[in-house]
């Protein structure tokens, strides 16, 4: 018996008639389903119990044998085997067809496989198969050619003239005869010869034919199997018939389609027995052919067969296709038990690793565990009474539940799960009510808020699953975001505001300049009203919580600080610097010396002479968390986060910051600014009327005048604002809102865009505080409506992008420690003009150096090759003035089906080296797809024609990853050389580039802006005009490296412009997947076929083999595939079929007899194996446990953090 859960590969092929018969348990002869009186299946019908097995467990059709003791007996009255009813899901039947029919996938698919094998056009095939023309199968000694088509008239004429010396036939029988006559070896050799000379159309046709014929030859499939003599009937439980309440029956469409086939087949048999006229028989055969077509793929040819209400019936192909098909609905997405969902509410008193689970929900989810425990504790005698106790909710059940859920993590998931932080594990605590309580800090990761969001709970059952949930998925472990390595659990909103308020300073506050002996005394004074949180005071430096970074000399001095900052620093680890000002040096090194004062000094004077120090905003809090994480790892960080959260909530409550209409102060000088702007606009309009400037220049100038006016107002507003204005505090702290919201409230709303995205030159001069006029309000509605429509579209687009990205990279897994490559990537800062988009430091951190880097001046070694570049080293490299560094990169990694640890570098989510088995492809896809919803949808419209619209945001990302021809394409140079002249020709310009060997002339399209000047030296692949380069063009004129770098740079540009940071390595993984195929140009002496797409590794393997034999290697050129195309070209047919174009992928795979080696994640999910990543990898599965001596360690019970 084969082990269903453990096999090495999966193969697909064409089924021969004998194979179909061997699967079958009997022939279905009648179209009947069930008897309408007895409701029992009819004998020999589509639900026959003799063929498919009994309907009830261990019971035959006539009832002679009942009970399990007759297992395996075949009833002598009704012929039904006594067995489980489950076999009705696996036993197949068959229909013996009275005439062969063609399989529509192979005849109708594009390209038509049958047509390629026979070298006939699909049109001709259709005429033969559907009985419109005869085809010559044997020409004999007549002037006819084999495979020649004859009409009815011609056929009769030739029959009269030549008698029976030639043979011609119609229908699938004729095609079958032709397919059987093919000598594959002969055809293949003939085509290979032809390829040496053929050109153009003939060559492409020959390549296509060769590919199909080679597939047949190598796979052992026979071409004649594309014609069916026997039709398999799938098991009845997979096409069920169920009784509805009203006594009517609902049935699967397949039964209708099968019934049509059986009816026509039986009628054809009868006609043949009667010896009916050929024209009637032909018509019946055609109808049989159409019935089988409809069963296999309804609607592929002609009009689909419809059921009641003109609804097309769902055929076998439709069962596989699309979101509702077998692949995506049942194999890749299953419903799971031990799960529940409920509304979420905030749980501010939870610890980082906890969540609140409603009592009734927990009881239902942990039922089996509670039952077992009840029996073990002797509270119930057996499982049945334990179950009864739970159903009656008796009081002792709750105590048992408490002990069961202790230490048993549960998973919380919020849809849409855009990245892996959308599912995290928590320790449950029981809460009253029916809502799940969620820790406020994990909301960012889930993108959750409490306006009615719901979340699902799942229970990990096995001890391995629990261990994984606790060690890898616990919320306290997931502090960093996998996309950029920055903390994702930063406080937000109230928490930020509270900590901001806590660390404010106010000159002249009550009790300024008082000196206290320690923190406690200062707090006492605060509680009794002698000082305020914002009061600047002094305490002995040695008395504060985290004084370990102070020098001995500093410890003898007084530390100038505020009461609030004393409280804030209490939450930090002892060896962390005392944070007194929001600067990088204070965070990373130590408290600045200016805050230490000798004990005898006049404290009040010293304080009065100082400026107020800025409070800590959201960004600083984020930096503090990152720094604590870097030094103290997980346990300490999550403790500190909880304390920071508590402080934030406590002091935002104390602060009582509110917003009232009186807080919005309208700017006094606004009218003057607007008058000035209006005067400038009038002047521009005058110039335009006199014909001094064009319409376009006028428009641009007007827009810029109003934009400047708005900026001036914004600047003055921000200056005039009181630093303690509640709205200002909210925006300054990063809790809510920004400067632009402010300007709209108190300054002016500014310019708006119309529905097409063009800016309307009439500005909205009012602010919300003053109120808008009717026209202004109307103009504003455009933007508001477009915003809402965009958001809805964007979500769907972004989700689809993520799906394609996941699909193309799902098999990229870290497979080994070092691939030993000698290649690398030369990187520098990414710039757009003079603006740095991504600094060298950002690109270096967490990567391995490919070559040793030395200081340009001193020559000291900054980093050796193959060593990890840490934050400090990266900073040193940048400070040394090094511009470019050679690093290891996923682009140049030699590992098959994945990457190696060295080329990938550090795992951003943990801040440590990446582990073997990490599914970096999926993480990359999630990291690029998840921020997709934050990107804009807009294409910027610069008024008029010139400088075509530049695509930005999400559409641009799709354009890059799908390798489409970009909008507003730039012209690039194909050679190195010098720009000699730029000529004006008619209505366009021409750029002449002179190289060492040849001179090229490039026509510049109308309206494009030039980027080069005469006399400038340029290199191949360089842009001559502004715009986006077409990466396919770039690949033709340069090499792979240039294309990889270009794509990486462009993706980073789009995301960084929108303020989204993504690690380079994620983009590298995706781009690598787009460039892993080559197209063979010349096969040399290898077995590969010219014109085919091959994986780079397959190609090099084939070449290595012939080179060792001293023969001619093949040549190929790299191909850039868009992600959709790349997913469909993957080696795994299961993965490709479950992605898109299911029928096409399966048709192709069957003919080639493809083997799926099950290397990716999707394939394994589909067949129900563990995914070969993480702990599912073979190297982690075959682990033996060795019992070691238990070392005596005292573990505090209430802290369950796990160090990584």
Swiss-Prot record:
EC number(s) stated in the UniProt entry for this protein: 2.7.7.6
CC cofactor note: Binds 1 Mg(2+) ion per subunit. Binds 2 Zn(2+) ions per subunit.
Named cofactor requirement(s): Mg(2+); Zn(2+)
Residues the record lists as binding Mg(2+): 449, 451, 453
Keyword Magnesium: yes
Molecular functions (GO terms): DNA binding; DNA-directed RNA polymerase activity; magnesium ion binding; zinc ion binding
EC category name: transferase
Keyword entries, A-Z: DNA-directed RNA polymerase, Magnesium, Metal-binding, Nucleotidyltransferase, Transcription, Transferase, Zinc
InterPro entries: DNA-dir_RpoC_beta_prime (IPR045867), DNA-dir_RpoC_beta_prime_bact (IPR012754), RNA_pol_asu (IPR000722), RNA_pol_N (IPR006592), RNA_pol_Rpb1_1 (IPR007080), RNA_pol_Rpb1_3 (IPR007066), RNA_pol_Rpb1_3_sf (IPR042102), RNA_pol_Rpb1_4 (IPR007083)
Highest taxon of source: Bacteria
GO BP term, pick one: DNA-templated transcription
Binding residues annotated for Zn(2+) 2, in chain numbering: 819, 893, 900, 903
Catalysis performed (reactions): RNA(n) + a ribonucleoside 5'-triphosphate = RNA(n+1) + diphosphate
An annotated GO cellular component: DNA-directed RNA polymerase complex
Binding site for Zn(2+) 1: 60, 62, 75, 78
Self-association state and partner proteins as the record states: The RNAP catalytic core consists of 2 alpha, 1 beta, 1 beta' and 1 omega subunit. When a sigma factor is associated with the core the holoenzyme is formed, which can initiate transcription.
UniProt function note: DNA-dependent RNA polymerase catalyzes the transcription of DNA into RNA using the four ribonucleoside triphosphates as substrates.
Membership in a protein family: Belongs to the RNA polymerase beta' chain family.
Record-given protein name: DNA-directed RNA polymerase subunit beta'
Organism: Bacillus cytotoxicus (strain DSM 22905 / CIP 110041 / 391-98 / NVH 391-98)
């Amino acid at each position: 018996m084969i082990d269903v859960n453990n096999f090495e590969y999966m193969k697909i092929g064409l089924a021969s008639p004998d194979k179909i018969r061997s699967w079958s348990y009997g022939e279905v002869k009648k179209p009947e389903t069930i008897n309408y009186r007895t409701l029992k299946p009819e004998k020999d019908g589509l639900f026959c119990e003799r063929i498919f097995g009994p309907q009830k467990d261990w019971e035959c059709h006539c009832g002679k044998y009942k009970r399990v003791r007759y297992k395996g007996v075949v009833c002598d009255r009704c012929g039904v085997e006594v067995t489980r009813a489950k076999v009705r899901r696996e036993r197949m039947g068959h229909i013996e067809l009275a005439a062969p029919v063609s399989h529509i996938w192979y005849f109708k698919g594009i390209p038509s496989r049958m047509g390629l094998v026979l070298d006939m056009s699909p049109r001709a095939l259709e005429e033969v198969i559907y009985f419109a023309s005869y085809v010559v199968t044997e020409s004999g000694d007549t002037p006819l050619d084999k495979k020649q088509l004859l009409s009815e008239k011609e056929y009769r004429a030739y029959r009269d003239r030549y008698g029976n010396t030639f043979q011609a036939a119609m229908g699938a029988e004729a095609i079958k005869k032709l397919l059987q006559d093919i000598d594959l070896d002969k055809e293949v050799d003939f085509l290979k010869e032809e390829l040496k000379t053929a050109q153009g159309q003939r060559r492409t046709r020959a390549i296509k034919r060769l590919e199909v014929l080679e597939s047949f030859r190598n796979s052992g499939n026979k071409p004649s199997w594309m014609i069916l003599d026997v039709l398999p009937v799938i098991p009845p439980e997979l096409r069920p018939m169920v009784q509805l309440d009203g006594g009517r029956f609902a049935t699967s469409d397949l039964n209708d389609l099968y019934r049509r086939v059986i009816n026509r087949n039986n009628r054809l048999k009868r006609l043949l027995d009667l010896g009916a006229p050929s024209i009637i028989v032909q018509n019946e055969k055609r109808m049989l052919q159409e019935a089988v077509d409809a069963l296999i793929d309804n609607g592929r040819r002609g009009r689909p067969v419809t059921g009641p209400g003109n609804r097309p019936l769902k055929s076998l192909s439709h069962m596989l296709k699309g979101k509702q098909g077998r692949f995506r609905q049942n194999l890749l997405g299953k419903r799971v038990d031990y799960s529940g969902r409920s509304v979420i509410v905030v749980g501010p008193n939870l610890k980082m690793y906890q969540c609140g689970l409603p009592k009734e929900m927990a009881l239902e989810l942990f039922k089996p565990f509670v039952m077992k425990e009840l029996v073990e504790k002797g509270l119930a005698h057996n499982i049945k009474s334990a179950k009864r106790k739970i159903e009656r909710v008796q009081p002792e059940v709750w105590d048992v539940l408490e002990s069961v859920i202790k230490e048993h993590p549960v998973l919380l998931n919020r849809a849409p799960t855009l990245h892996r932080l959308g599912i995290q594990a928590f320790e449950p605590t029981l809460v009253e009510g029916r809502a799940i309580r969620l820790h406020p800090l994990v909301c960012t990761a889930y993108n959750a808020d409490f306006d009615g969001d719901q979340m699902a709970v799942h229970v990990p059952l096995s001890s391995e699953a629990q261990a994984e949930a606790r060690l890898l998925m616990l919320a306290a472990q997931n502090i960093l975001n996998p996309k950029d390595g920055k903390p994702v659990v930063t406080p937000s909103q109230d928490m930020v505001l509270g900590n901001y308020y806590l660390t404010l300073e106010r000159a002249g506050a009550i009790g300024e300049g008082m000196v206290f002996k320690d923190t406690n005394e200062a707090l006492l004074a605060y509680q009794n009203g002698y000082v305020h949180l914002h009061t600047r005071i002094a305490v002995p430096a040695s008395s504060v919580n985290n004084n370990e970074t102070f020098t001995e000399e500093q410890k003898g001095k007084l530390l100038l600080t505020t009461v609030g900052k004393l409280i804030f620093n209490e939450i930090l680890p002892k060896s962390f610097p005392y944070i007194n000002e929001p600067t990088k040096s204070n965070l990373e090194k130590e408290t600045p010396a200016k805050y230490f004062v000798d004990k005898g000094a006049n404290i009040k004077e010293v304080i009065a002479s100082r400026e107020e120090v800025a409070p800590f905003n959201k960004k600083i809090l984020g930096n503090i968390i990152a720094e604590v994480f870097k030094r103290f790892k997980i346990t300490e960080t999550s403790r500190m986060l909880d304390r920071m959260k508590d402080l934030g909530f406590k002091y935002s409550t104390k602060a009582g910051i509110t917003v009232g209409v009186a807080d919005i102060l309208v700017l006094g000088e606004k009218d003057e600014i607007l008058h000035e702007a209006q005067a400038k606009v009038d002047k521009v309009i005058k110039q335009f009327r006199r014909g001094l400037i064009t319409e376009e220049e006028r428009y641009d100038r007007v827009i810029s005048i109003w934009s400047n006016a708005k900026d001036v107002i914004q600047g003055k507003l921000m200056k005039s604002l009181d630093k303690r204005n509640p709205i200002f505090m909210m925006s300054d702290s990063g809790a809510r809102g920004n400067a632009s919201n402010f300007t709209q409230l108190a300054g002016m709303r500014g310019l708006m865009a119309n529905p097409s995205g063009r800016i309307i030159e009439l500005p909205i001069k009012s602010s919300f505080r003053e109120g808008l006029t009717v026209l202004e309000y109307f103009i504003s509605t455009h933007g508001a409506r477009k915003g809402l429509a965009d958001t809805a579209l964007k979500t769907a687009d972004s989700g689809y992008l993520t799906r394609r990205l996941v699909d193309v990279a799902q098999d990229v897994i870290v497979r080994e420690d070092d691939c030993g490559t000698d290649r690398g990537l030369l990187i520098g800062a990414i710039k757009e003009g003079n603006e740095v988009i991504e600094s060298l430091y950002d690109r270096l951190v967490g990567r391995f150096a490919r070559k040793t880097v030395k200081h340009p001046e001193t020559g000291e070694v900054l980093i050796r090759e193959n060593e990890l570049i840490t934050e400090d080293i990266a900073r040193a490299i940048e400070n040394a003035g090094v511009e470019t560094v050679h690093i290891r990169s996923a682009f140049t990694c030699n590992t098959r089906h994945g990457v190696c640890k060295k080329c990938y570098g550090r795992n951003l989510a943990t801040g440590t080296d990446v582990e073997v088995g990490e599914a970096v492809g999926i993480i990359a896809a999630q990291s690029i797809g998840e921020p997709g919803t934050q990107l804009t949808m807009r294409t910027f419209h610069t008024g008029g024609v010139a400088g075509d619209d530049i695509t930005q945001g999400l559409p641009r990302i799709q354009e890059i990853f799908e390798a489409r021809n970009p909008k507003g394409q730039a012209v690039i140079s194909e050679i190195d050389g010098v720009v000699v002249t730029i000529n004006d020709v008619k209505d366009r310009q021409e750029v002449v580039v002179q190289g060492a060997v040849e001179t090229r002339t490039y026509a510049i399209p109308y309206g494009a802006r030039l980027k080069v000047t005469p006399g400038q030296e340029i290199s191949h692949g360089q842009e001559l005009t502004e715009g986006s380069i077409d990466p396919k063009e770039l690949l033709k004129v340069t090499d792979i490296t240039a294309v990889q770098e270009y794509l990486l740079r462009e993706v980073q540009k789009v995301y960084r412009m929108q303020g989204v940071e993504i690690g380079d390595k994620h983009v590298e993984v995706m781009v690598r997947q787009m460039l892993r195929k080559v197209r063979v140009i010349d096969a040399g002496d290898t077995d590969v076929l010219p014109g085919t797409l091959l994986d780079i590794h397959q190609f090099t393997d084939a070449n290595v083999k012939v080179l060792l034999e001293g023969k001619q290697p093949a040549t190929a050129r790299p191909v850039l595939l868009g992600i959709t195309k790349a997913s469909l070209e993957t080696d795994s047919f299961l993965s490709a079929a479950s992605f898109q174009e299911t029928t096409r992928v399966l048709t192709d795979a069957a003919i080639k007899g493809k083997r799926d080696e099950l290397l990716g994640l999707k394939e394994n999910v589909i067949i129900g194996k563990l995914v070969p990543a993480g702990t599912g990898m073979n190297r982690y599965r075959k682990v033996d446990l060795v019992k070691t001596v238990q070392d005596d360690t005292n573990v505090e019970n209430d802290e369950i953090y796990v160090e990584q």
